[in-house]
């Protein structure tokens, strides 16, 4: 299913582990790749974790890097020029951009300047003034009014993501398309045998396992999560916290755990391509992010019947099953501890049918992608 006759569109997604990239790869796996396939635009010239997977599906990795330029100002100029040449030299006709207005509208401008006929802007982030710097806010506000002149299709994973990324008239007039973050639902179905095996392998058979998956950055609010767990551990000494992911704040969070003397109870698990098994081992999934467009991890956790505790800053579109509860970040940490403890006797079973009805089956999302882009390509 990797025909040379397949028509390709260019998508922006880093090829390391992450929610957006995982979603795009899952969609790609469900395409009829004899008809439509993805190529990937990356901004850094290095081998990444998921690169071999997409190359194996017939994709090309297209690099527009300026990492070889030391001067910061010149690096920016060089990156823009190389992006322009990338679009021009590869005769790109369709670009599917996963991003936000403050960081990615430059790519849109360059794409249009180079002759790209159709740009879809697909936003996954609901943003937050808590962690965004002033320059980012200023750039976002400056770019938004320009978007309708350069962007051909507006897609969002949630209403909050649309409000954060798109001009007001696009949101008010509902010009954007809601695209659920589809997953391979069956892969996450609850399985008691897998749960028991993974818990044995991890050495947490008799533990109350709290889980989290997310990049170590300010947005994900790991500091708050660790503080909540520290309070929980004082009341439940059988509790352990499994943190999946990597990122720039991982080391500082490890130092925080050491200061709290929780090294034996908080485990930094790194990245894995078997998260579906890790959800099985957990008892509660906690996500206190400052904001989320629509967290894929929250959908995956629900599919496995795992109770999910979210900050009320996270979009409500993820609230599909009876597994989900929300709490304000302004609440005392004792309220979070109490809510986590309330899940000890939660009845665990798969919720995949509920999620399928809500549109979170990656097969349905892939079908929409394919029909949409084949129709666009037919018109070009």
What are these regions (language model features)?
Residues 149-189:
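A short, active-site helix/loop in glycosyltransferases that binds the activated sugar's phosphate group
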Residues 18-26, 208, 212-231, 248-254:
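A conserved mid-protein helix/loop that constitutes part of the nucleotide-sugar donor-binding site
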Residues 189-203:
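A short helix/loop element that forms part of the nucleotide-sugar donor recognition site in Leloir-type
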Residues 100, 271, 290:
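Aromatic "clamp/platform" in nucleotide-sugar-dependent glycosyltransferases that forms part
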Residues 10-18, 22, 26-78, 176, ...:
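N-terminal strand-loop element at the rim of the active site
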Residues 241, 249-252, 262-272, 278:
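Active-site donor-binding acidic/aromatic loop of nucleotide-activated sugar
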Residues 307-311, 316:
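Short hydrophobic beta-strand element within catalytic cores of glycosyltransferases
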